[in-house]
Amino acid sequence: MKISYNWLKEYIECDLAPEAVAEALTSIGLEVDSLEQIEEIPGGLAGVIVAEVVECVDHPDSDHLHITKLNTGEAELLQVVCGAPNVAAGQKVLLATVGTVLGEDFKIKKSKIRGVESFGMICAEDELGIGESHDGIMVLDPEAVVGTPAKDYLGLATDALIEIGLTANRVDAASHIGVARDLYAYLKHNDIPCKLNIPDVSAFAEGEGEAIPVEVLAADGAPRYTGTTIKGVKVAASPEWLQKKLLAIGLRPINNVVDITNFVLHEIGQPLHAFDLAKIAGGKVVVRRAEEGEKFVTLDGVERTLSSADLMIANTEKPMCLAGVFGGEESGVTESTTDIFLESAYFNPVSIRKSSKRHTLKTDASFRYERGADPLVVEYAAKRAALLIQEIAGGQIVGKVQEFYPEKIEKKVVELDYNHIENFVGKKIGHDVIEGILENLAYEFIEKAETGAKVAVPSYMVDVYRECDIVEEILRIYGYNNIELPQAMRMSVNAPQKPEPEQVRKAVSDFLAANGFVETMNNSLTKSDYYAKLKTFPEEKCVRIMNPLSSDLNVMRQTLLLNGLEVIAYNINRQITNIKTFEYGSVYSFDPEKDGKTLDSYEEHTCYALFISGQPEKSWRTDPGKGNYFQLKGYLELLLKRFGCDIYSLETEAAPADIFSEGLAYNLPGSHQPLAVMGTIAPARLKQFGIKQPVFAAEINWPALLELVKRNKIRYKELPKFPEVRRDLAILLDESVSYADLRKSAFRVGKKLLKQVGLFDVYRGDKIAEGKKQYALSFVLQDLDKTLTDNDVEKVMSKLLSTFQNEFGATLR
């Protein structure tokens, strides 16, 4: 936003230079992006001075040139050759000395004109840029003082353009008076002499006769609307002072009436609009919503299609203005206008913002309205503009000001606690200082007490609602630089959760990604039909959506497994048959035994799900084989071991048959808390999703995995110095005996020397009786203190075989 320094000084009397003003504004939150010096004439006529023609004679080699000698206030006279017909001795003139630059690039140089040296140029009006006459040189008042710079003699104005990077919440400062108010509060707080001057509108008086009536049909869009009828105006060019003000901030003067509305906008911050009274059909102004598809031609000549949400200023026949955004081509003020209707209103910010965005129109008016204009300045702005119109364009106010204002808009009231404010600020700044700053910012004190106060917020402070907002106001005037840094830091220290869930999650995801799994993300909403025939996840435990978008998204998922099968089916249907995916996400359930009105009726927790299906592409190096049950089991157990889990210490049971045709469920020992479930997806579930190839899946209970990590204590031990010994054993067993039982017994017997037990072959078939199976087991033994002898190894192996025979009926093969 652009602010003219000279214009600003009309509202605040102070002795601050433009640079000091810019620094002050930045310190109070109105950050100055740039400060540019502006001169009425580029260059400020530097090098041009008042001189006296002491002698003037004709040039001996010309019929029109003159040789003059001028007094410039120096000891010696200056010789200048001049061709002006009106130059004469005794005149006071403006002399451009050698080195002066006139206009953009005309530099005065020492020259020789027809053999006579010339040391400057006596100037005409057009050469100086202060007029258009070139009939002769400018002849000054005889009282002009020789040596006076032309800038001072002519009274050329200099100005400074202050460019403020206005934030969206500071629409109160989107005007010269708005900036002056803030600057006044700053200067008063710092005891710098200043005075705030707000233009007086007490001379405004309503006239006789009938004013144009106003009807508001869209009160939600225009909570306050006023119209002033002025007749007998003379539309012409604006006076020089008004044009200069607008030009200083980059606005193009149009005519006196339009220029006044723009002037008041940038003076007060209230947008105004003037209509040609003769173009208001039916003699009535109507504020209404547009009809859907209605056509309207704006001031830029573009025909726009309106929406029923657009707020319009219309007559009885058609729209005249897109309210708060842009005027219409047909209703604007022109040179033939004699009577006008002056609008000043407060429009709904949301309505204006949507219309501005819908029609891609950004104007000075919409900029202010969509951020929240001041509803209480509407009347003042109308009076200010009407008085200026009468002063500059003539005319008389007709009838009463027409106003629609059904519900009075009150100022916001905020209660303050001084101790709370000082704690928030971090410094005891004093109650009198707080009150002084707020009074300088025009806050009204409704109640005062020793501990606090109740204040009415100025209507133009649209972003102030709460005590913390007022603290910000106090701080920016008091000065952030005046708040000393504390010598001690007071803070609460929260011990980080151990283990940190995000770190564990990252480790799990990195592990899976490193092993070829691709992460997927699915919608938490799914269809209830998936759960219709499940016992593990019954449909009645689904959390139902009250207003579902469709029947496919009517419940929250109870498990990640079904969503994962959707992904697999989707990929298989697109010829991607080799699949390894995982997902991390939340699952939800409802307790049907509770009423559902309280949070304890619902449960949410997170899970990991893993899926393997299909066969990887063959390589010249190896045949990877098909994805299978044991491949998935290996990944799952490797993952659990990664976080310190002893797989064989977990409690296991069969996986639920309605989800898996075969599989295992792992529970934490002691607590029976479910940790993971894995297996081959049941054919019924595959059919449900149209999948015709085997799918192997696992689901990990995330809270249980975190509990497992929490239990895990890292222990360090010295690397073994003595060699390992491996022995193999083939035994015949009943089908009912599991490898886990054998392993547990083996470690119980050989716990001192036995380090590893492995199953490397399972055989069923020829020469093996029905109901029997053969296990080939490997055993790794090691003593940390010495090298094992054959005798040591044989003793352990004998004990193992004896245990297997006695406990499981094993037979050595």
Model-inferred region functions:
Residues 414-582, 727, 780-784, 792-813:
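Extended, well-folded interaction surfaces typified by the phenylalanyl-tRNA synthetase beta subunit core
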